[in-house]
Design a protein with these regions (language model features):
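A short amphipathic helical element positioned immediately N-terminal to and/or at the very start
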Residues: 210-211, 415
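Conserved motor-region signature of P-loop NTPase helicases/translocases
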Residues: 1-67, 177, 219, 226, ...
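Short, function-defining helix-loop hinge/capping sites that tune catalysis or transport
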Residues: 92-94, 210, 242-243, 282
Length: 486
């Protein structure tokens, strides 16, 4: 046992039997809790390593968890199933996919490959309105987004078709809406079958097909239910509905079939998350998963981690004052718990560490940031901060004057943006004022169009049967070829 765990962390680690909801605020050591819980389960002989399933949101988080568990255990205990949802489903489908007619040698398509695949087969689908004559590829991206959202919501092609056909019986539904929905449902069904026929899957298919496997082959499901004595899920607030369904099915509660079991099952299922950190709704994450956990498993124990080891108390108080605007749709309200974070570390900062700056435009904001960095690093004589607005503990703002008196290195400064596109004006100003920077996120080398094409070239050269890569190469404007020519 890690002696550095605080009391709440220790309770979470040592909890033995039944469902467990760990509400872990930012910087409260949730990764340490999950890894120490896995180690404790093994050391206490509650389960063997290969009888534990831990699911995370990203490959980076999975690797970190795997490394921490590996470092805490003797050699030979590295058999815990620690992976992302997609990697777990990929592993299951490679082994069991034949039960639902899936070729185990399927190809997993990236977003770009999915676009090329759908575009290639556009005239093989029953498209009318969504394949306009003047611009047949106009809705390709929209169709893929729509299909992806259906997958995120655990909607099968058969269910979508049933829903679409039922619209014709509703007087309140216009004919055009019915026809559009039926066209989309029909194409969703055809596109899904087309992917299966060509042994091509996308990331949404991994989740949906694993759910399909478990629903249609109860003997396969039972085998994995008996295998995994403990299931742990990290960043539960970031899971989409289908991922939550997958976890619940493995835990003995299928939301589509087993609602009569609500309150009767109490699996060894641990979910860790924080509704206040739910930021991925734009890509399908369903905050309802964590909000409804106690409804599905009313016997679940609830542990709240509030001791923060990462931040200044003023920052925590300001964030708390802001996030309370989401009430009453927060676990703090629905579960009647106190989620206010308490800083456990001291920092060599002034008390006035949280300031709100407003600018007239994106360019003005970018210019202010660049000049402020120059001022902070001692590369500018002008005081760029003339007035700021500061959040107090209640979340209200108060005006103050701020004159930086401390010099930093460029590497001491970080700029966080809500979306990659918001960084453009900032980067332009950093370049203009000569501020060195490194741009993170997913806009690096491998996401540049010319690099994608180059990779497709290399793939086509090494495997002439790779139709997706070949199509991407041939569809380049430089060749002047029509899509009907290949």
């Amino acid at each position: 046992m890690n002696l550095n765990l605080n009391e709440k962390q220790k309770q979470a680690v040592e909890y033995k039997k039944g469902a467990l909801l760990i509400i872990a605020g930012a910087g409260t050591g949730k990764t340490a809790v999950i890894t120490q819980r896995i180690v404790h389960i093994i050391n206490s002989k509650w389960a063997k390593p290969d009888e534990i399933l831990a699911l995370t949101f990203t490959e980076k988080a999975a690797d970190e968890m795997l490394q921490r568990v590996d470092e805490s255990m003797p050699i030979g205990y590295g058999d815990v199933w620690i992976s992302t949802f997609h990697s777990f489903c990929d592993r299951i489908l490679k082994q069991e996919g034949y039960n639902i007619g899936l070729d185990s040698d399927y190809i997993l398509m990236s977003a770009a490959q999915s676009y090329v695949f759908l575009r290639k087969h556009l005239f093989d689908l029953s498209l009318k309105k969504f394949r306009p004559y003047g611009n047949p590829t106009r809705f390709v991206s929209d169709l893929l987004d729509h299909f992806s959202r259906l997958q995120d919501e655990d909607v099968s092609p058969a269910e979508y078709l049933e829903y679409a056909r039922a619209l014709s019986k509703k007087d309140s539904v216009e004919k055009e809406e019915y026809e559009d929905t039926l066209e989309l449902a029909t194409v969703y069904d055809e596109y899904t079958k087309l992917k299966m026929k060509n042994s091509m899957l996308d990331f949404g298919d991994l989740i949906l097909l694993t759910i399909k496997l478990f629903r249609e082959k109860p003997n396969v499901l039972k085998r994995y239910q008996e295998k995994f004595k403990y299931i742990l899920v990290d960043e539960f607030q970031d899971t989409n509905y289908s991922q939550s369904v997958l976890v619940n099915i493995l835990s003995g509660l299928d939301p589509k079939k087993d609602m009569d079991k609500v309150g009767k099952v109490n699996p060894n299922l641990t979910v860790v998350g924080d509704d206040d950190q739910a930021i991925y709704k734009f890509r399908g994450a369903a905050i309802s998963n964590i909000l409804q956990f106690k409804q599905y498993y009313p016997k679940a124990k609830k542990i709240v981690l509030t001791e923060n080891y990462r931040s200044h108390q003023k920052i925590l108080d300001s964030a708390y004052g802001l996030i309370k605007n989401n009430n009453p749709y927060r676990l703090e309200v629905t579960e009647k718990v106190d989620k206010r974070l308490i800083a456990m570390e001291s920092f060599p900062f002034d008390d006035d560490v949280v300031n709100l700056i407003t600018a007239e435009s994106e360019d003005a904001e970018g210019e202010w940031i660049a000049k402020e960095i120059l001022s902070l690093t001692g590369n500018s004589d002008e005081t760029s901060v003339k007035g700021t607005q500061k959040f107090n503990e209640s979340g209200q703002s108060a005006f103050l004057e701020l004159v930086p008196d401390r010099k930093y290195k460029f590497s001491d400064v970080a700029i966080l943006v809500r979306a990659n596109a918001h960084a453009d004006s900032i980067v332009q100003n950093l370049r203009y004022f000569g501020v060195p920077y490194k741009l993170g996120g997913s806009r690096g080398l491998y996401f540049r169009d010319e690099i994608k094409v180059l990779i497709s070239f290399l793939k086509a050269l090494t495997d002439y049967t790779d139709e997706v890569s070949m199509y991407m190469v041939l569809s380049m404007q430089e060749w002047g070829l029509s899509t009907r020519e290949f």
